[in-house]
Structures are given as C-alpha cells and as structure tokens.
C-alpha cells in the first residue's frame, strides 16, 4: 500500500528496472499535454519498443484516459495502480 503516487513510482521503478531493462527513460515526459508519468525505451525481441506508464492511486478513470492518449505515441501504454 502506498500513501503517495511518488512512493508508488519510486517503488515500481526500483522493481521494474532492477536489471536495467530500460535503455533510456524519462519521468514526466512531454509526449502529450500534461505529460506522461514515465516513458521507457526498451529492447523487446530484438526490436526497440517505447512504453508509457501512468501511476494512479485515485481517479482510475483519468488514468485510463491518459493511457489511451499516450497509446498514440508508444507501442504499449500501462497503468500502475
């Protein structure tokens, strides 16, 4: 359980990227109005893949809308709750 979205982001990132799977990454990436919470560039099956992540503890409806908007610019768009 996390009290803040920042705690959620930090804990997620520590566990997600423990093996340095992301070639590059940026928090608060300006790919759309309002910024995506996290964008990663990764190699997946010998192909470069762009992923976006939205972190939400509340307002899941907003997270879905943000992830849908992000999906226009990335290969996969994820919601972390």
What are these regions (language model features)?
Residues 12, 38-40, 49-59:
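Conserved catalytic cores of phosphodiester-cleaving nucleases, focusing on short active-site segments
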Residues 31, 71-72:
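A sequence-level detector of short, solvent-exposed, charge-rich linear segments
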Residues 64-69:
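A short acidic, amphipathic alpha-helical/loop segment
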Residues 30-33, 58-62:
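Short secondary-structure boundary/capping elements
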Residues 1-34, 44:
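Acidic-basic catalytic patches of nuclease active cores, encompassing PD-(D/E)XK
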Residues 34, 49-51, 75:
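A generic structural signal for short beta-strands and their flanking turns/coil linkers
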Residues 45-47, 72:
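Flexible, charged surface loops at secondary-structure boundaries
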Residues 56-60, 74-81:
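Nucleic-acid nuclease catalytic cores
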């Amino acid at each position: 359980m996390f009290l803040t979205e920042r705690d959620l982001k930090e804990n997620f990132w520590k566990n997600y990227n423990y093996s340095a799977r992301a070639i590059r990454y940026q928090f608060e990436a300006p790919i759309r109005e309002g910024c995506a919470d996290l964008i990663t560039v990764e190699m997946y099956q010998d192909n470069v893949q762009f992923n976006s992540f939205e972190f939400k503890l509340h307002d899941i409806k907003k997270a879905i809308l943000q992830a849908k908007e992000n999906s226009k610019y990335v290969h996969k768009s994820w919601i972390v709750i």
